[in-house]
Every structure is written in structure tokens, then in C-alpha cells.
């Protein structure tokens, strides 16, 4: 039984996969910028606390899973062309035909994000100078299912807890 201090987690940015696809195309995004190149955020929290003036409390629960995935690419990335064209096609048809599904998967960990309906919100701000610049793409997701997980083997305690919560753990993450 390994203690949490004895577990070495591993993360590799080269193993993060972002794929967009619909009935017309499938594309694995490449050309990530240096530094933070993807962020995932829900637009409305799943629950918020309400406190009355007499210090009574309630919780507001929301089912809205609308989310934003921000992908930052360097300007030389060919994925800029794909995302630009997807936006152009979506703007020209204006009927959702060019919406796509999106998958973000950490290949060295357990994090996984998926939306069956997403679209490019806007063109990124473009700057040009003596250095390579970046392009930040906002991808709006209608309903995002997400699992934010770790990147190392699980301890016995975490493994048992996840099983008690009804999670089937991939054997590669089971305690050694």
C-alpha cells in the first residue's frame, strides 16, 4: 500500500488531445502555445449559496452545463485555419450545421471533457510583431460533461472511495 507521498504523478502537455468533429470533418488540434494553452470553465456554477438577511441559508441548484473552452494556439498553427473556416461556415449557414462536438482528454491522466454541441464564439484577437504571437479561441459548449481527475496511481483509500461512489476505475490507475 503506497502512501500518497510515494506516488509520482506524470503530466505531459504533448499527450493532451483536443479533437473537434461533425458530419463533415474531424480534426485534432495542434500547435498549442507555450504556457497555458487550454482552459475549461462552466458558465453557471452547478450550485450557489443563498443567505438571507436573517442568516438563513438555501442552495440554488442549476442544470445549465454551458461551458467555455479556451484554446490558445501559436500563430503558425494550421489549426487556426480549421477553426477560422469552421467559424466562417457557421456564420454563413446560421443553422447549426457547422457546430461540432469537442473532446479534451489528458492522455497521461484521468481528466476528460466532452460536449456534443459546440461552436466558435468569435475570431481571436490577432497581433503581429517580431516574435510569434498567440491566438486564443473561445469555443462555446452547449452541454459539457466533464471529469477533472489526477495524473498518478490512486492510493488504496482513494480507490475504495471511488468504488463506493459507483466509479469503475481503469485498472492502470489502481493501487500498485
Model regions and ranges:
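Intrinsically disordered, low-complexity terminal/linker regions enriched in Pro/Ser/Gly
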Residues: 2, 149-176
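Solvent-exposed edge beta-strands and adjacent loop segments
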Residues: 2-78, 118-135, 164, 175-176
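Short, surface-exposed beta-strand/loop "edge" segments at domain boundaries and coil↔beta transitions
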Residues: 24-29, 79-80, 105-115, 147
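Residue-level recognition of well-ordered beta-strand positions that form the cores
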Residues: 70-74, 103, 138-142
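"Short basic amphipathic alpha-helical interaction patches in structured regions
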Residues: 83-92, 115-119, 153-156
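Short, acidic/charged, Gly/Pro-enriched secondary-structure junctions
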Residues: 85-113
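Hydrophobic lipid-interacting interfaces of membrane-associated proteins
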Residues: 142-149
